Amino acid sequence: MARPAACLFDLDGLLLDTEPLHARAWREAAAHFGRQLNAAELMQLRGRRRLDCAEQVRGWIAGAADPESGAARSDPPSVEALLVHAQPMAGAPELVRRCAELAIPMALATSSSRAAVALKAAPHPWLELITVRVHGDDPELREGKPAPDVFLLAAARLGQEPSSCWAFEDSPAGARAAEAAGCRVHVLLPEGGDPEAYPEGVRWLESLRELVL
């Protein structure tokens, strides 16, 4: 199999094991308004921008929360303090280092804000190898996942056609975004994830260690 022209990586749930912490934050925020989020609803929030998630949660709690209120805070202080302890997903550091060794261009295509990425990435110097980044609050980003914008922008900043790039995702929203951008999509299926929620034709991974470059 030919190597990709570039690799475009999601962050949460793909390179770092932060998704359980974000799920906890949204569960607590909704519970504050008397709404219990189930696993399927939490999966719908996975991979999306904070304010996009807040709008969704506000709908679920019948308009009780404003996007800038407590329900919009994806990282309450108690959870934010835990993010710096998030561990790498199995095989993530090795994959990123392998791309660097092979001089395969890399970009981060994440829904997390610049500040949130800085917080999560600080304990993981291997993430510094990914110097091109598109954050959820990037001023050039028009729409968040599942729109393709984040992957289109990441590929453009690397000077590559999206169709020549491999995109790595874990969420249905992210996989749909990467597919819509025209990337070859690799999905690290999360525990409890429903394959039918993802686009057809993705390459499934049980671990990033499976990937050979």
Residue ranges of predicted features:
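Metal-dependent phosphoesterase signature
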Residues: 36, 56-97, 102-104
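Helix-loop "lid/cap" segments that line or gate small-molecule binding pockets
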Residues: 27-30, 49-64, 120, 154-155
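Conserved SAM-binding loop
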Residues: 15, 88, 106, 167
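Active-site neighborhood of HAD-like aspartate-dependent phosphohydrolases
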Residues: 1-43
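Phosphate- and divalent-cation-binding pockets in alpha/beta enzyme and binding domains
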Residues: 25, 53-56, 91, 116-119, ...
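Asp-based, Mg2+/Mn2+-dependent phosphohydrolase catalytic module
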Residues: 1-5, 97, 113-114, 118-213
